[in-house]
């Protein structure tokens, strides 16, 4: 399957809603429901310790601010969702999703309940509604992101062996909600967050105008445009300098016009940020993503790999945030079903692309010098997120935004030193060379 790139571009809208990399804990008085999660499929006492503290575990005060953050998140979606500069498209484009066979249901009631029992929490959408529309893309995507969250959390908790995920389920007054899972200060992971969000409502007139400016003709009814946005996102910061940071995000968005016509698209990506370069790890990560992409077309991986290298560029440093991966947005072809299958395949590649690398290095010995370099590289991670990530910038400059949610993608610790430069031909200099000149890792 061929793939074509056109004009349009990045994904600030989703991070504006989710607080960058889906870390939003939007709030209403009903959303302070944090708990320590026992992973699905486990029973009895666990050797890990629960983390029932920190901003994710507190309710009570500040609910007015949290409600404002929810509204700011919607404003973020409206203002940023449609400011793209690039677009992904798999061609040829068909007229839409395949029609389901008469009487066919993706899940019967018992099977749906079984699937949901493996999630970190019950779905945002009520089960009766999911059963009512089994072939609707909103149902398929919500179940997929819930499964992805559970799979990633289960894998990370197993690797850590000490800390549990705190599960924070929140509801959005205007419609929808989400589940934020956080593991912090564990044995292996300094900070790991895996979050899903399913929100819906009406786009503002400002958002509609920005979307029209992008070339989409939208017909409003009573000045309203119903929308649905959902996705899963994660950022993972291990403690060991030889275990890399990883981020992924997969999302779906649709807007319904007055005449019933729906505009829809998918976006997402997965990227790796090592402190020290390990050629074998880089090849494994990129090869796993390439194998996922190749199931849907031989031209997809190289285009999305380049898009990732270009997006995660720290201009003032002249280097990338990491060694890349894949990145795409506004994917609306060749059909809704095929685009969904592609996104699902990519999401399924998250655990096999990353967890073996963490297992390999989580117990590596390291020196104070290694840890210092990790902290300096974490500083670069912070610089990109605060200075260049559109969703983060929008949230920080939006009155009433929930800062804890916006900054949750940042590591617990980072460092800056004046005029720091690693010795020539050192292992620190080796990673800088790759960050300044991206490599082809799979050929």
Curated annotation (Swiss-Prot):
Residues 103-112 have a biased composition (Basic and acidic residues). It comes from the Eukaryota. Pfam families: Coprogen_oxidas (PF01218). The modification Phosphoserine is found at residue 101. The record marks 316 as: Important for dimerization. Expressed in erythroid cells. Expressed in liver. Pathway: Porphyrin-containing compound metabolism; protoporphyrin-IX biosynthesis; protoporphyrinogen-IX from coproporphyrinogen-III (O2 route): step 1/1. Belongs to the aerobic coproporphyrinogen-III oxidase family. This is Oxygen-dependent coproporphyrinogen-III oxidase, mitochondrial. It comes from Mus musculus (Mouse). The gene is Cpox.
């Amino acid at each position: 399957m061929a793939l074509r790139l056109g004009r349009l571009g990045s994904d600030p809208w989703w991070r504006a809603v989710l607080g960058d990399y889906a870390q939003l804990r939007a709030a209403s008085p009903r959303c302070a429901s944090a708990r320590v999660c026992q992973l699905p499929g486990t029973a009895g006492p666990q050797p890990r310790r629960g983390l029932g503290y920190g901003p994710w575990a507190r309710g009570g005060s500040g609910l007015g601010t949290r409600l404002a953050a929810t509204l700011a998140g919607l404003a973020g979606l409206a203002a940023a969702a449609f400011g793209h500069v690039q677009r992904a498209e798999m061609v040829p484009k068909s007229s839409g999703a395949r029609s389901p066979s008469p009487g066919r249901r993706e899940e019967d009631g018992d099977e749906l309940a079984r699937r949901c029992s493996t999630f970190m929490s019950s779905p945002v959408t009520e089960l009766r509604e999911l059963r009512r529309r089994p072939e609707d893309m909103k149902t398929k995507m919500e179940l997929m992101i819930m499964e992805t969250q559970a799979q990633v959390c289960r894998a990370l908790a197993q690797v850590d062996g000490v800390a549990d995920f705190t599960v924070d389920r929140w509801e959005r007054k205007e419609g929808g909600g989400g589940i934020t899972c956080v593991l912090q200060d564990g044995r292996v992971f300094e900070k790991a967050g895996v979050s899903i969000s399913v929100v819906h409502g009406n786009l503002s007139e400002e958002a509609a105008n920005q979307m029209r400016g992008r070339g989409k003709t939208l017909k409003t009814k009573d000045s309203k445009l119903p929308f649905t946005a959902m996705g899963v996102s994660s950022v993972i910061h291990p403690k060991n300098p030889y275990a890399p940071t990883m981020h992924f995000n997969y999302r779906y968005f649709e807007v319904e016009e007055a005449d019933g016509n729906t505009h829809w698209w998918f976006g997402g990506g997965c990227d790796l940020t090592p402190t020290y370069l390990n050629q074998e790890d880089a090849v494994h990560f990129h090869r796993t993503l390439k194998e996922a992409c190749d199931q849907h077309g031989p031209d997809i991986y190289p285009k999305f790999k380049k898009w990732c290298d270009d997006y995660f560029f720290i201009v003032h440093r002249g280097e990338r945030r990491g060694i890349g991966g894949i990145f795409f947005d506004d994917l609306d072809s060749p059909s809704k079903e095929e685009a969904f299958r592609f996104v699902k395949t990519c999401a399924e590649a998250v655990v096999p692309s990353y967890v073996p690398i963490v297992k390999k290095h989580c117990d590596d010995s390291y020196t104070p010098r290694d840890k210092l370099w990790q902290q300096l590289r974490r500083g670069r991670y912070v610089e990109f997120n605060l200075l260049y990530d559109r969703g983060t910038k929008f949230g920080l400059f939006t009155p009433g935004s929930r800062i804890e949610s916006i900054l949750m993608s940042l590591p617990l610790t980072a460092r800056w030193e004046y005029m720091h430069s690693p010795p020539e031909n050192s292992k620190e200099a080796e990673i800088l060379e790759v960050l300044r000149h991206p490599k082809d890792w799979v050929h």
